[in-house]
Amino acid sequence: MLRSLHSAATLSNKRFYSLISHSNRKNIIKKLLRHPSFDPIRHHLPEDITTIDPYSLSQNVIESLNKLEVPKKDAAMVHNMMIENLSDLDYGVATIHSNNLRDLDLKPSLPAIKQIIRNNPGRVQSSWELFTQYKASMENVPDELMEVVLEKIIKFDKAEKVDGKKSLTYQDLVRCLYLINHFSSNYNLPSELVEPILIYIVDNGIPNVLGSVLKYKIPLSFFDKYVSEMTQYQICELYDFYSLDNIVADPLVLHKCLTVLGENEKIQQTEEEKEIISKLEEEIDIVKSQCHDNWSLEFPNWSVRKTATSFEELFLEIQKRNIDKKDFELAHKLLRLIGAFKGKVSLFFKLYDEYLLKFKNNEDDLMFEAFLTLCCQGYKSSNEKMLQYAEAFIKEDFDSKLESKIQSVLIVANAKANIDLSLKIYNSNISTAKREKDKYTDLAESDVLTESLILAFLSRDDADFARVIFDGALGEKLISGPTAAKKIKNLLAQYGEALETKTSKQVMQTKIEHYMESI
């Protein structure tokens, strides 16, 4: 039996949906009623039918269908047409006519289902819940329906907005990934539906899922705005997905990939990333249950990624295209990575000679890199001769900023072999070190020199003298402010923690290496 008008009226009293203002509502209704499916009832509708609101129109249509005992198939066409054309004016129309279809033991048409989900306010059932209900009766879910559902997840149901929802959740992400993984291989998904998912992934440092979304032809340039925020793990995913041609053609991504692959021998998931994966797996199980599907997300089969091969591949591509000869920042970065980080001294000096000829205005920066490479590798290998060779690259007319860096490096580089020399260098330079703070680091040259000396003595397990240095610097007002003081206190605290595990010397020596690599 068709649902009675009494039931429809009761439903009307319960509905939470407001009538949407629509300037051409009358024209929409006129056009709708001219459709052949309304032929059996058209002459039984009131003459002013085009002027009434959609909900009242539904009441009149249902009354006519009941009175005229219109055949089931023809009535279904009318119900579907009402849903397809009027749901965006008043969602109550979709509710009434979908219930009538259910009473006829029929399902809404695909266009009707799309309108039901598209306009669902989400207070009674979420759009995802509606989707899973309709999906259960479908052998194959059409791409166009999944696109509507994806859009509702990304843009939120109206009820979610009213309740203050501002961003996606892990639950939303997994539902999006489910839909994305079920689109036909050749389906052209609009970028405006893909990009918000990528932004959420980047903003929340989510590993393992970029590849599933990137298959929808997102240009690498999309990440230019976000590459600085991406985790090391995500950068590796990006590098693995795009071709070398794409990577080297995008300067921002190229620099970031080079940095991540060059500074780290391996990239491994952090504890936070492992926790995120665990939460995603929980949501995947829920979606599988809701959708009665054995779907699983194919995560990359590595949790630890060695970088040597990828770095070598990228370096050779840069060399082949002479990109480093046109970009000093890139050339400078390569010298730091190959020299200080990787210790390939012969290759470093080959590049150094090439860059001296190519970038004649940047001689000071290049000479500093040569000095730093020899200091860094001399310290790592306990090679005093390297430290002596390093001083050959110190010019008398270096600017004060480079000069300050040089003294700081010499203080820590000599910590293993000659700590007295480290102290001598500090005492010779601290009185002339600038006290003005750098606007980016909030540290003065005197802060950096003092921190270097304290680190040098901590690497020798001489915490007592390190504290004497700190107290003396505070007393002599060599510490410029709270930023520097806090930084040194943190260093002393890290030493204390390492001392408890009997790894203090190793930890502080590693800190010296990182200090020189990143200065």
Swiss-Prot record:
Subunit field text: Associates with the mitochondrial ribosome.
Transit peptide stretch: 1-35
Protein name per its UniProtKB record: MIOREX complex component 12
A GO CC term assigned to this protein in UniProt: mitochondrion
Leftover remarks: Present with 3280 molecules/cell in log phase SD medium.
Species this protein is from: Saccharomyces cerevisiae (strain ATCC 204508 / S288c) (Baker's yeast)
Role noted for this protein: Component of MIOREX complexes, large expressome-like assemblies of ribosomes with factors involved in all the steps of post-transcriptional gene expression.
Keyword DNA-binding: no
UniProt-annotated location(s): Mitochondrion
Principal subcellular localisation of the protein: mitochondrion
Keywords of this entry: Mitochondrion, Transit peptide
